Amino acid sequence: MSGSQLGKTDLLLNIVGYHIAHDPSPILVVQPTLEMGQAWSKDRLSNMLRDTPSLRDKVADPRSRDSGNTTMHKIFPGGHITIVGSNSPASMASRPIRIVLVDELDRCALSAGAEGDPVALARRRSATFWNRKIVQVSSPTLKNFSRIEDAYKRSTRKTFWIPCHSCGEMQTLEWSQVRWPENEPENAHYHCKECDS
C-alpha cells in the first residue's frame, strides 16, 4: 500500500523480469480491467522485454509468426505470463499459477458474476505451489473500505529498515527527514534521525 506514482507497477515489472530470467514460473498479472491489462502489456511489459538484454531473447515478439505469443499471453522457457482484467476472469480458470501479481487492487472488480471475486480466484490459482508468491499493490481509495488497506492490516506489517551511512543507526525512511535548500528541491537529501547527518 502506498501513494500514487511511487513505483508499484515498476515493482511488479521487476518481479516479472526476475522470474523470466532467473526463476521461470507461471505468472498471472491481474489488472483492474482488460483494457488496462492490454495497455500495461503494450506500454510497460513489452518495453521492458525489448530493452532488457537478459529478457529480450527469452520472450518472442508476438508479431513473429511462430512465437505463439499474444499481447495478453507470453511464453518463455520454463514458464509463461498471462495478463487478465479483473472484469473478465475466465482466462484465470484452470491454470495453476505460482506467481500472482495484482495491480491496483482497490480498482479491481469485487465480483465477476458467477465466478465470484476475481482476486480471490487468482489467489486460488497458486494453491498447489509451496513456493507461491502473491503480490498485491494499490493506492488506497476509501478509508475502511479499501481492499489494500484491509490486506495491509491482515499482513505482518513489516517495514524496511536501512542503516545510516554515518552512524549506522537502523531506521525507516520518513518524509520529514528529507530536506533541501530553499528553492532547490533537486538538492534534496535525507537526514538521519539519530545523528542528523
Predicted features and spans:
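Phosphate/NTP-binding elements of NTP-utilizing enzymes
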Residues: 1-197
